[in-house]
């Protein structure tokens, strides 16, 4: 133990940290100056009898502030925009002699200079960017106010009071939970740091509570639906709890840079008891496999109720939950998938693949890993801490990969800064650059201890970067927002800029992008279905008038989606003779029995093919990952697809394998249609079908979606979805 005494503040009169939205101390109902004379009753002065917040879903406050989708009976408004309240008094309000104001308080130690105590004066005209309240109706004993909040206001849940002045001091309404008011970021307000000027983008990146996340491999792109559910009951409070759990000072909660950085640390539980425990080892004891989750709602509600991390998540689950957190608070956000994503252990913009002298991959020496895909988030905001031009989309990553300022977090990193090589600007831009723009270097490890660079592939990493398209389920290619095309002058300048600002590059790969060879090699993998045999075809093209003999080596591996190999299940060496200007093909049969017993949950197989031309000693190298085609869950509905009407949902799954599936779980949910549910089946025999029925009553109209998943001991990553159009209930 350290002998250094703990720091104390007793003699300084310091105010303790104000870092909990949930904590609070009620303001006094009477704040009097001196004694009240005998015979004087304070009730004779102006007194508040009721406060009306117009907080129902159909009221103008929620409609105009785009918060009517929240399943929450409190007033929810967005900062920098006016909203309406009505105050009823014990007598008519006379502005010539009566004085009152509205007060908003957040946290336990409210201070006006910290933005945690907000006195809102009644003014004749509202001023842009400032708190104020204007009387727009004064009839009988009621006053209606147009209240304007600051576009820099703290985001959170405020307690509301009305204070009235008397000759003897202030009378204040009692604390009433019914008048609590949530204030969120406002992408519709030009003065807000998260302002987004395109309405379709706002509808997608703030208001859409259903999304799609892309996974699989560049050569075999898959997508799955994800229920963000940011408007579901309890989710807003759960997101505020995440910041409380981080002990984030309330005064910083109006800054989207700080909020998103705290969120990137708190969505993972690596070092701060955050939301999700990450697990990449295919063992999920005492928890739920990452592939079983169908959305964020269950995860956040469980975290809020238990106040302990939820087990388990991987990158797409973390990104889905982080997206819910950001959209719920009002920060425009989207999930990004980077195919062939580099995890560069030594941050040198270089992924080293070591080969043995016979051309096989040395898994012992190869430490860097190329993830088949990696998901992170982008959040939209201005960056006043950076030079002009680096605002807009910021990369934020909650997957715990590397330590940043003492915690596992990443970002916000300006996507524009990453593209142009300005990696000196905070936060974590060098790491993001490495993920999307490293070189893949093949190195032969000689027996004498020397290393020989055989080939450099400058296009493999960051092969494709995508997100869900606006207004649909398709894919939008955003690769060019992160990097210039390989070979362009701008790409070379961006890399030089990154090196100038401190990015490392162990090997000068300029001019080494492709080994000079008269022979081209490629290979294709036919459509591979889980539990079936398939073929790999390697093609050699001789572009010269020379005769060549080639020694080739194929390695098939069961891999985690992170690129880490679990088991080499197939090896095959073969020789090829290439006549001048000829083409030769070699087929390798992959039998189901060779891979099924080792298979991991995402059904990923990774193939390396290396070949050495005996006459020139040139080494050719290619790698490719495939995703086995996995059966889907089927969802059907019957009944009336109308708000408030019973609808029966049926989930079906047929086991296509020759083995019995054990410990089967089906998960089902749909924001606005049904709460998350799950059901267990002890086993499903080969070719057998299980059915599960649930009755629900939709409460949100319009386009909705049901998501389902199936997980078992030996088969996972099985999904299904169903689009619905829910009608409004006719008005009587």
UniProtKB/Swiss-Prot annotation:
Asked if the keyword Calcium belongs to this entry, the reply reads yes
Protein's organism: Rattus norvegicus
GO MF annotation list? metal ion binding; protein-glutamine gamma-glutamyltransferase activity
The molecule here is called Coagulation factor XIII A chain
Active site positions: 315, 374, 397
Write down the chemical reaction(s) this protein catalyses: L-glutaminyl-[protein] + L-lysyl-[protein] = [protein]-L-lysyl-N(6)-5-L-glutamyl-[protein] + NH4(+)
Q: Which domain of life is it from?
A: Eukaryota
| GO BP terms in the entry | blood coagulation; blood coagulation, fibrin clot formation; peptide cross-linking
Residue ranges annotated as propeptide are: 2-38
Q: Please give the SUPFAM superfamilies that the UniProt record associates with this protein.
A: Cysteine proteinases (SSF54001), E set domains (SSF81296), Transglutaminase, two C-terminal domains (SSF49309)
Q: Which UniProt keywords apply?
A: Acetylation, Acyltransferase, Blood coagulation, Calcium, Cytoplasm, Glycoprotein, Hemostasis, Metal-binding, Secreted, Transferase, Zymogen
Q: Which residues are recorded with the post-translational modification N-acetylserine?
A: 2
Glycosylated at which positions?
614
Where does the secretion signal sit in this chain? none
Q: What is its main location?
A: cytoplasm
Ranked from the top, the taxonomy reads: Eukaryota, Metazoa, Chordata, Craniata, Vertebrata
